[in-house]
Curated annotation (Swiss-Prot):
Keywords: Chloroplast, Membrane, NAD, NADP, Plastid, Plastoquinone, Quinone, Thylakoid, Translocase, Transport. The gene is ndhH-A. GO terms for biological process: photosynthesis, light reaction. This is NAD(P)H-quinone oxidoreductase subunit H, chloroplastic. GO terms for cellular component: chloroplast thylakoid membrane. It is found in: Plastid, Chloroplast thylakoid membrane. NDH is composed of at least 16 different subunits, 5 of which are encoded in the nucleus. Its main location: plastid. GO terms for molecular function: NAD binding; oxidoreductase activity, acting on NAD(P)H, quinone or similar compound as acceptor; quinone binding.
Length: 393
C-alpha cells in the first residue's frame, strides 16, 4: 500500500467555548494541516449582556454597580472610567485626598489583574507552581480591598466626586507592608520563570508584532509597549494625580510573547513604586466633593406623607448630563479603556460607547497564529490577556 507524500485534506477544530485552557467563553475555529495552523476564526458574543444599552436606560449612579462586570478582574478601572466621564462632562473637581486614594486602588487592581494573568498563562505553558504563588499574593491585595471597600471583588467604591468611604485606620500601614513583601515576590517570580529554558523555548519569538503593526491594529497597553512603542496614558495623557509621582513606562522592543511577559512583570514593580509614593504623600481633607450632592434633587419625604407611608424604596439620586459629548480614557491593565459619552440634558446618557482594550487586542490573534503550531495558540492567546466580560460586554 502506497501512502501519499503530502496530505491534501485539512482538519477543522473547534477550540472552546468550553476548552479547559480557553480564557473565558471564546470559541476559535482553527483550520489545521497536521500541527500547523492554516487559519483561525474567533467567534465572540457568548458573554454579551448588552452593557451599553443598559447604560442608556439608567442614571450614572444606578449603572455604577453594573460596570464591575466588564473586566471582573480589574474592577477599579471600570469604576474609574464610569465616574470620570460625568466628572469631565460637568467639570466636577475631585479632592486631592480622593485622587490619591483612587490611584492607590487603581494600582493595586493593576497588580491583581497582572497576577491573575501570570498564573493561568504559566499553567497553559505547563508550569503549575506559579499558579499557586500568584493566588497567595492576590489574596493579600483582596484583603486590602475588603478592608477599604467591604468587598473583595465588585467593589462599587468610586463615586462621582470622590470615593465611597475614607481609608480605615491602619490600612496604610498594611498597604506598605504588602508593598515591601510583594517586591520580594516579583524577584522570586523572575528567578523562577524568566530564565527557565523550557519557558523561553515556548515564548521567545512566538507571536511577533512589530511596532508598525501594533499601531495599525490599534493595540494598547502591554501589547503596544512590548513592540517598542512607549505609550502609557498615565504619562502621555495624565489623569488623577499620576503626574505627581516618579515612575517609568515599562517597554520592550522584541514584540514577542516573552516581551509581553516582561512588560507586565515590570509593570507590577512600577505599580508598587507608585503606591508607596502615594501612601506616603497622601494629604488630609475630604474623600469626596460634598458640592456634588447638589445633584440629589429628590425632595425629602415629610412625616406621614404618601411617600413615607407607602413607598419603602427611596428614589435614587439624579445627575443630569448636559448636552455635550466627550471621550475619556484610562490606562487599564490590558490597555486603553475608554468611554464615549453623549449627554442630552437628561438623566440617562444618550450614547454610552465602551472602548474595551481586550476586544481591540484580540483582533490580531488570527494573524499571529497563522503558520504557527497548534500548541502555540494558547501561548499567543495567553500573552494577549483577554477577559471575555469586556470583549463581549
Amino acid at each position: 500500500m502506497s501512502l501519499p507524500l503530502t496530505r491534501k485534506d485539512l482538519m477543522i477544530v473547534n477550540m472552546g467555548p468550553q476548552h479547559p485552557s480557553m480564557h473565558g467563553v471564546l470559541r476559535l475555529i482553527v483550520t489545521l494541516d497536521g500541527e500547523d495552523v492554516i487559519d483561525c476564526e474567533p467567534i465572540l458574543g457568548y458573554l454579551h449582556r448588552g452593557m451599553e444599552k443598559i447604560a442608556e436606560n439608567r442614571t450614572i449612579i444606578q449603572y455604577l454597580p453594573y460596570v464591575t462586570r466588564w473586566d471582573y478582574l480589574a474592577t477599579m478601572f471600570t469604576e474609574a472610567i464610569t465616574v470620570n466621564a460625568p466628572e469631565f462632562l460637568e467639570n466636577i473637581q475631585i479632592p486631592q485626598r480622593a485622587s490619591y486614594i483612587r490611584v492607590i486602588m487603581l494600582e493595586l487592581s493593576r497588580i491583581a489583574s497582572h497576577l491573575l494573568w501570570l498564573g493561568p498563562f504559566m499553567a497553559d505553558l505547563g508550569a503549575q507552581t506559579p499558579f499557586f504563588y500568584i493566588f497567595r499574593e492576590r489574596e493579600l491585595i483582596y484583603d486590602l480591598f475588603e478592608a477599604a471597600t467591604g468587598m473583595r471583588m465588585m467593589h462599587n467604591y468610586f463615586r462621582i466626586g470622590g470615593v465611597a468611604a475614607d481609608l480605615p485606620y491602619g490600612w496604610i500601614d498594611k498597604c506598605l507592608d504588602f508593598c515591601d513583601y510583594f517586591l520580594r515576590g516579583v524577584v522570586e517570580y523572575q528567578q523562577l520563570i524568566t530564565q527557565n529554558p523550557i519557558f523561553l523555548e515556548r515564548v521567545e519569538g512566538v507571536g511577533f508584532i512589530s511596532g508598525e503593526e501594533a499601531v495599525n491594529w490599534g493595540l494598547s497597553g502591554p501589547m503596544l509597549r512590548a513592540s517598542g512603542i512607549q505609550w502609557d496614558l498615565r504619562k502621555v495623557d495624565p489623569y488623577e494625580c499620576y503626574n505627581q509621582f516618579d515612575w517609568k513606562v515599562q517597554w520592550q522592543k522584541e514584540g514577542d510573547s516573552l516581551a509581553r511577559y516582561l512588560v507586565r512583570v515590570s509593570e507590577m514593580r512600577e505599580s508598587i513604586k507608585i503606591i508607596q509614593q502615594a501612601v506616603e504623600k497622601i494629604p488630609g481633607g475630604p474623600y469626596e466633593n460634598l458640592e456634588v450632592r447638589r445633584f440629589k434633587k429628590a425632595k425629602n419625604s415629610e412625616w406621614n406623607d404618601f411617600e413615607y407611608r407607602f413607598l419603602g424604596k427611596k428614589p435614587s439620586p439624579n445627575f443630569e448630563l448636559s448636552k455635550q459629548e466627550l471621550y475619556v480614557r484610562v490606562e487599564a491593565p490590558k490597555g486603553e479603556l475608554g468611554i464615549y459619552l453623549v449627554g442630552d440634558d437628561s438623566l440617562f446618557p444618550w450614547r454610552w460607547k465602551i472602548r474595551p482594550p481586550g476586544f481591540i487586542n484580540l483582533q490580531i490573534l488570527p494573524q499571529l497564529v497563522k503558520k504557527m503550531k497548534l500548541a502555540d495558540i494558547m501561548t499567543i492567546l495567553g500573552s494577549i490577556d483577554i477577559i471575555m466580560g469586556e470583549v463581549d460586554r
